[in-house]
Amino acid sequence: FRPHLYPLIGPHGDSVTRRLAKPEDDLDHPHHRSVWVSHGEVNSFNNWGEGEGSGRTVHKEFQAVESGPAYGRILAIGAWVGSEGWKSPVRSNELLEERAEWTFYNTPNNGRIIDLHLTLTCQEMDVLFGDTKEGGLCSVRVEESMQVSSGQGGRITNASGGRNEDETWGKRAAWCDYSGPVNGNDVGVALMDHPASFRHPTFWHVRNYGLMTANPFGLSHFYNNTNRRGWLVLSPGQTLVGMYRIFVHDQGPDEADVANKYNDFAYPPQVSLAE
């Protein structure tokens, strides 16, 4: 139904994201596929779930695939479309063009850094991003042993010091971290929201069962107030931008210095040349 990034390998060689669901698996929320981009209400189409009637993101091409000593880069172009068989009232069946630029940095083994620069461009008809908690511009589903609900030591932490779902769900924060054990090693993954992203600092749809997603749309749910509206309408040619960093680290967020790693992302050193 949509592209995803899997596996997300941590510092000890194991994936920090859950295995991909197969039809015969009894996994909850099988549409939570490692690291992905989607939203639950796009012109009435559900491009978050899977199944009959769901919207889709169709991969079109890789405009760039690069590798080098400092970083590798992939620029993937996709199209957000309606459910299978849907016919648009305009020329194309595309609601949005997705440009997902992924940069994979060559970093020390105790920490891995991946940047996502996401641009969604409205095509030939107005597009409504609905106010729903089911979705987000960048989502992560962690390995099962890392889940808070597993009782094995998993924990959620946000930039404001909130802990676990009760203190982080629906809250705004510049970053959110999910840490816990994988094959005997304490590891974590932090998702960071850049100041240039839409509605920074983002709201978080983060759950004790392993989901962590940056969702800037679901305001009525997060505030529990139907007068707070988070929907957005794009007209043809308008764009929505999200910039995120995924920091996969050893140990917990304090030991990995996630707060300062966020500052490196949001406020990098500036270089100027004197004449």
Regions found by a protein language model. Name each.
Residues 192-275:
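Beta-strand-rich recognition/accessory modules
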Residues 1-29, 117, 126-128, 195, ...:
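Beta-strand-rich N-terminal accessory domains
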Residues 83, 123, 249-251:
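Short coil/turn motifs at secondary-structure junctions
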Residues 28-110:
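Extended, loop-rich substrate-binding clefts of extracytoplasmic carbohydrate-active enzymes
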Residues 126-128, 132-203:
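Active-site/ligand-binding surface loops and adjacent short beta/alpha elements
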